[in-house]
Amino acid sequence: MRARLILSSLLLASLAGCGGGSDFADLQSYMDEVRARPKGTIEPLPKFQPYEAFTYSAASLRSPFQPPVKIDLTVRQKGNKVIKPDETRVKQFLEGFNIETFEMVGTLSNAQGTFALVKGAGGVHRVRVGDYLGRNDGKVVGISEGKIDVIEIVPDGEGNWLERPRSLTLKERS
């Protein structure tokens, strides 16, 4: 019973705070004062220049990381119609890969001769003089302890063929 009395008195006291007193005159006067103040001006948005798309046009130029190649057309090596790849020859496995993917890793010598070990094309492969290496009909013509000499047959751009010497050198471990 006593709890009911306390609860009822608290309820009545809280309802008395919600009475109909409409004494908001000071709030209303402040709001009128704020509305009467002069309005500020907002600066207009700045004019933006339209975006111009950039097109990279140096893709066909020489890479800055490669040394410049001077081509003198008068001194340029001319191709020969006698030199041409043997189309009837059966291609070897290592001819299916670019020669740049191969790296010389060592040599082997036994009763059968000297072999070079090249790393690339998914493993380490053994090559000897007379084998072919790379996509340009590169024939191994010499093997020494430090390098493999290869002669490639490449087109000269005028319907003839050139023999281009290349070599794979043994990379020293550092």
Curated annotation (Swiss-Prot):
GO biological process: type IV pilus assembly; type IV pilus-dependent motility
Keyword Signal: yes
Compartments reported by the entry: Cell inner membrane
Signal peptide (residue range): 1-17
PROSITE patterns reported for this sequence: PROKAR_LIPOPROTEIN
Lipidation (N-palmitoyl cysteine): C18
Membrane topology: Lipid-anchor
Phenotype upon gene inactivation: Deletion mutants lack surface pili.
Disulfide linkage: none
Subcellular location, principal: membrane
Keywords per UniProt: Cell inner membrane, Cell membrane, Lipoprotein, Membrane, Palmitate, Signal
Assembly behavior: Interacts with PilO, PilN and PilM. Interacts (via C-terminus) with the outer membrane secretin PilQ.
Function as written in the Swiss-Prot or TrEMBL entry: Inner membrane component of the type IV (T4S) secretion system that plays a role in surface and host cell adhesion, colonization, biofilm maturation, virulence, and twitching, a form of surface-associated motility. PilN/PilO heterodimers form the foundation of the inner-membrane PilM/PilN/PilO/PilP complex which plays an essential role in the assembly of a functional T4 pilus. PilP connects PilO to the secretin PilQ. In turn, the PilM/PilN/PilO/PilP/PilQ complex facilitates transit of the pilus through the periplasm and clamps the pilus in the cell envelope.
Full protein name: Type IV pilus inner membrane component PilP
